[in-house]
Curated annotation (Swiss-Prot):
Belongs to the G-protein coupled receptor 1 family. A lipid is attached at C376 (S-palmitoyl cysteine). This is Neuromedin-K receptor. Residues 447-467 have a biased composition (Low complexity). SUPFAM superfamilies: Family A G protein-coupled receptor-like. Residues 1-86, 142-161, 225-247, 324-336 are extracellular. The gene is TACR3. One of its GO terms (molecular function) is tachykinin receptor activity. Signal peptide: none annotated. Residues 416-467 are annotated as: Disordered. It comes from Oryctolagus cuniculus (Rabbit).
Amino acid sequence: MDSFAAAETWTDAAGGAGADGRNLSAALAAGAAAEALGTEWLQLLVQAGNLSSSLPSSVPGLPTTSPAPSQPRANLTNQFVQPSWRIALWSLAYGVVVAVAVFGNLIVIWIILAHKRMRTVTNYFLVNLAFSDASMAAFNTLVNFIYALHSEWYFGANYCRFQNFFPITAVFASIYSMTAIAVDRYMAIIDPLKPRLSATATKIVIGSIWILAFLLALPQCLYSKTKVMPGRTLCYVQWPEGPKQHFIYHIIVIILVYCFPLLIMGITYTIVGITLWGGEIPGDTCDKYHEQLKAKRKVVKMMIIVVVTFAICWLPYHIYFILTAIYQQLNRWKYIQQVYLASFWLAMSSTMYNPIIYCCLNKRFRAGFKRAFRWCPFIQVSSYDELELKTTRFHPTRQSSLYTVTRMESMTVVFDPSDADNTRSSRKKRATPGDPNFNGCSRRNSKSASTTSSFISSPYTSMEEYS
């Protein structure tokens, strides 16, 4: 996560110095500085300082320094210098990511916090996810892209520390917010009789996620440095024990912010999916049961798509880092710069997809986006959209520490005392939770001429949580 462009800049300096035979000391100095960087580009940097004057600088991405006047014209060619049209296309691509991610996630935050109906446990974690994604897009994506294009750090020493520190923090907060949602869905569906997280407990979990994220990213902040070179300023991370320590740290980061949480979410959503889509529950089912089951499926389906999107977007970036660290000759490949820009763009684009997914798969978020863009002549907000965020479809009542949705049916019973024995023997046994025919809808027959069907959703939970 630390500065890719800084390593490339050192490569550029080393290659330019090596190309000028009169400045061997500068080449050695550049190579030593590159070694201090401790990035995955270390071997390339050392090699660049010892290249012959006939080999151009193998920098995967940035404009190079001007060669010495005495350098032969044939040596000026650099395969990594991009044409203007390509820079314009990359700028447009990164600009779209920043715009959609920032404004889309801010609207998601507004939809949840401004409407009481949307303030559920799951949605509080979605607020945290949206905040971390919007922050990543606003404070990291564009700055890193500018640095990669210009090979110069314009933003000062303090922002250099922030730039190397915050991306890991934001990604950690994002993926563990998704993990918390997965665990919450698991508890609500697999063990619904246990109390759900309260608003206070949810805030504590969110705070704990950010504290752990800060601790994981702290070394990046402590070891960040800026260095003023002739004509440019660099931002990089200098690890005390060199590149090996850097590589180990990033492997740990990949495990903690990618492999481990995806494993947890894969297990939980697999179990939840088998439960929700495994087959029809035997016995008669009431309408409310079917409706709540359908709502639960929609929420789980949406979150699975969010997780899969995140995994796909970040996988090429992690593969790129590991391969270029192990097989350093890849850094000389003609198209390595484009591969990096594409993998980094795909990773950063993960911040913009979630608002689109929410809008497409959840009618309340869709109604909220319509309200946010009601000023647009192509967007029409219906009365249904207005009511969707303001009213509740069900009015749960608190009974024995449980929220229930109850449907009452009345019937008339003619009772003949002479048939009492036959009535007792033919009376249907009431289904219980241990009965395989029990499906959440209980039916009670009695002499009092009333039949009650009730569905117990989960403790402290209403249908609002799943709609």
